């Protein structure tokens, strides 16, 4: 009963993905593209959605999955159970646990949910997975704010009504689909059981951005579309989306924001969401209380080139984020006890993460190393 569509993006030198055995299978539709023709994952997913042929359901997957026996029955039982609970259009989506490609065995088998991580400086909201608390006690899927593009199960009409924007590239795809699906009347859930595993590694396999030197151009266009669709950072909606890749009419963007505890215009997040409590978020008596419920966490990674750190006797790094006028918005230094772990690696870049609450977006950062012998060394700066 399965119809399978694969967007096969490959190179003549590839030896690990021969699909010849499936080309004559009437249930398998292979869209054959040279790797040089590919424009990324969202483009590929959009291509697949154009092949929808009236099937009752759609399950969107990445490559590299392993399934439990009876996964389809389990998934449909979850779907129908949610409908019996009053959710007309359930969308069951998840980051799923990993498996070891060499052994084929699961790395872990606990079901995951997604939580808010941070707003990127370019706009998109980022999420992270974690184990669903007390999942063994659950009898059904749990509500979600967010969407995973590598496992998404819904009615077949999802392929027509919530199509992937082929001009999206990578980051930003999932948050826009979460909002768009919600406005089309879909209710988002995470499965409370592990139905499959995904291979996340593949370090030796080239990605699209490894082969295509223009990927930064794709990224820039994608980020702009995310910001303008969701109004992130005060961007104004641009209806060149022609509504095909825009919102539905069953709910509004603001209704999603109230449901999820996210406000895109100023990158605001409610504490209820930061505490990883299930949606929907609490209602507020008036607009003032609603506005006061938002905090503005800023999370950022500064990459410092190791070659800039030539001394071997550092005692601290001053580490600050500044506004456009050069005033400190936040300062949290790297102290001496943190330095051994930070500097012991061999990577060319040293990653310094900071997270703090701010309404004003930082404009620049400063890392200023302090050496026992030389005192304050040359400062290292960057624009955000």
Map each language-model feature to its residues.
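Terminal low-complexity segments of carbohydrate-biosynthetic enzymes
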Residues: 104-105, 123, 127-139, 143-153, ...
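Catalytic cores of eukaryotic secretory-pathway lumenal/extracellular enzymes that build
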Residues: 1-257
């Amino acid at each position: 009963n399965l119809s399978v569509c694969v967007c096969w993006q490959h190179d003549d030198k590839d030896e690990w993905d021969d699909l010849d055995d499936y080309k004559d299978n009437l249930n398998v539709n292979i869209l054959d593209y040279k790797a040089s023709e590919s424009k990324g994952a969202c483009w590929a997913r959009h291509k697949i959605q154009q092949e929808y042929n009236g099937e009752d359901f759609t399950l969107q997957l990445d490559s590299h999955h392993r399934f439990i026996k009876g996964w389809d029955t389990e998934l449909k039982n979850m779907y129908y159970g949610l409908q019996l609970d009053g959710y007309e259009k359930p969308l069951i989506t998840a980051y799923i646990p990993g498996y070891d490609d060499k052994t084929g065995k699961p790395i872990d088998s606990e079901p995951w949910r997604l939580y808010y991580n941070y707003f990127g400086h370019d706009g998109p909201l980022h999420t992270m997975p974690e184990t669903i608390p007390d999942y063994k006690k659950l009898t059904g899927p749990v509500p979600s704010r967010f969407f995973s593009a590598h496992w998404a199960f819904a009615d077949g009409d999802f392929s027509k009504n919530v199509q992937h924007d082929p001009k999206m590239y990578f980051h930003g795809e999932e948050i826009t689909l979460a909002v768009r699906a919600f406005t089309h009347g879909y209710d988002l859930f995470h499965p409370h059981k592990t139905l499959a595993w995904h291979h996340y590694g593949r370090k030796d396999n080239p990605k699209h951005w490894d082969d295509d030197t223009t990927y930064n151009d794709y990224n820039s266009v994608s980020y702009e579309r995310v910001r303008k669709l969701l109004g992130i950072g005060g961007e104004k909606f641009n209806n060149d989306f022609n509504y095909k890749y825009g919102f539905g009419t069953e709910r509004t963007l603001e209704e999603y924001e109230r449901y999820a505890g996210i406000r895109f215009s100023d990158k605001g997040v409610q504490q209820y969401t930061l505490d990883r409590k299930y949606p929907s978020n609490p209602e507020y008596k008036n607009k003032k209380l609603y506005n006061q419920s938002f905090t503005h966490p800023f999370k950022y990674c500064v990459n410092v080139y190791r070659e800039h750190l030539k001394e071997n006797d550092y005692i601290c790094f001053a580490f600050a984020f500044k506004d456009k006028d050069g005033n400190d918005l936040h300062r949290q230094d790297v102290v001496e006890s943190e330095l051994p772990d930070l500097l012991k690696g061999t990577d060319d870049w040293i990653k310094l993460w900071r997270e703090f609450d701010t309404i004003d977006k930082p404009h620049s950062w400063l890392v200023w190393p302090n050496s026992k012998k030389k005192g304050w060394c040359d400062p290292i700066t960057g624009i955000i």
